[in-house]
A protein has these predicted regions:
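PRPP-associated nucleotide enzymes
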Residues: 1-214
């Protein structure tokens, strides 16, 4: 079950919404938050990959030779935004185990709300034959996600999909303003941002809740 508006797909499946309710709950402990984040990401990945191109191949079943469909081109690249995006990585890899993995290190300056890049390590994308999934739990102001998408595009990805747990309208507008061709897949679009740039109602600081820091 999904709702799609202007390049944003909100996955409304009951399992996603049920698990999201516990991610939002401030009393959910770190160990459960971490597990739930991976499970929701797994379910979002199913939707995020639905338009990947396929090509025919042939295999031998125990009974006969038959034609099958396989994802076309090179293996997908999964690129979590450090550090919080790491909490989503296993959810994707549980479905797309052959994916290549890249890392984009960004943190948000809490005064300017602008992203600061400190590390980028991506798989080979320069041939334009590899689709990329960027993982960023919270699409808040959209600046960090936009910077991560820009890095992946610059490296040569064929297409880019952003998967996030929760998005704010402000973040969606900013990302689409800079990267109109990027599809966004999320479990929810929330009301907006508070004066500190946090999504409300949101689920708090995803990185802190994943790793038990403050």
């Amino acid at each position: 079950m999904t709702e799609t508006l202007s390049g944003v797909t909100v996955v409304t499946h009951p399992l996603v919404q049920h698990k999201l309710s516990y991610l939002r709950d401030r009393d959910t402990p770190t160990v459960h938050f971490r597990k739930l984040a991976g499970e929701v990401t797994l379910l979002l990945t199913y939707e995020a990959t639905k338009d990947f191109p396929t090509e025919p191949a042939e295999v031998e079943t125990p009974l006969e030779r038959t034609e099958v469909q396989r994802i076309a081109g090179k293996k997908v690249a999964v690129c979590p935004v450090l550090r919080a995006g790491l909490g989503m990585l296993d959810g994707v890899l549980s479905l797309v185990s052959s994916a290549r993995v890249g890392f984009i290190g960004l943190y948000r300056d809490e005064e300017t709300l602008r992203p600061v890049e400190y590390y980028v390590k991506l798989p080979e994308l320069g041939d334009g034959e590899r689709d990329a999934i960027v993982l960023d739990p919270m699409l808040a102001t959209g600046r960090s996600s936009a910077a991560a998408v820009a890095a992946v595009k610059e490296a040569g990805a064929r297409s880019v999909t952003l998967v996030c747990l929760v998005a704010a309208p402000e973040g969606i507008d900013h990302l689409q303003g800079e990267h109109a061709d990027v599809r966004i897949v999320t479990a929810a679009v929330d009301r907006g941002l508070d004066e500190r740039g946090f999504i409300v109602p949101g689920l708090g600081d995803a990185g802190d809740r994943l790793y038990g820091t403050k």
